Amino acid sequence: MANTTGRIPLWLIGTVTGILVIGLLGIFFYGAYSGLGSSL
């Protein structure tokens, strides 16, 4: 855990990126399956 001053830790970047990707995919699939044609 050295050299983290002034930088964002890699685990934090990975966690935030993973959450964002999963969230976007979840919203996309939710809109596709729940709305089908109404969301387009």
From Swiss-Prot:
Its main location: plastid. GO terms for cellular component: chloroplast thylakoid membrane; photosystem II reaction center. Keywords: Chloroplast, Membrane, Photosynthesis, Photosystem II, Plastid, Reaction center, Thylakoid, Transmembrane, Transmembrane helix. Disulfide bonds: none annotated. The chain crosses the membrane at residues 8-28. It is found in: Plastid, Chloroplast thylakoid membrane. The keyword DNA-binding does not apply. It is a single-pass membrane protein. GO terms for biological process: photosynthesis. PSII is composed of 1 copy each of membrane proteins PsbA, PsbB, PsbC, PsbD, PsbE, PsbF, PsbH, PsbI, PsbJ, PsbK, PsbL, PsbM, PsbT, PsbX, PsbY, PsbZ, Psb30/Ycf12, at least 3 peripheral proteins of the oxygen-evolving complex and a large number of cofactors. It forms dimeric complexes. Belongs to the PsbJ family. PANTHER family: PHOTOSYSTEM II REACTION CENTER PROTEIN J. One of the components of the core complex of photosystem II (PSII). PSII is a light-driven water:plastoquinone oxidoreductase that uses light energy to abstract electrons from H(2)O, generating O(2) and a proton gradient subsequently used for ATP formation. It consists of a core antenna complex that captures photons, and an electron transfer chain that converts photonic excitation into a charge separation. HAMAP family: PSII_PsbJ. This is Photosystem II reaction center protein J.
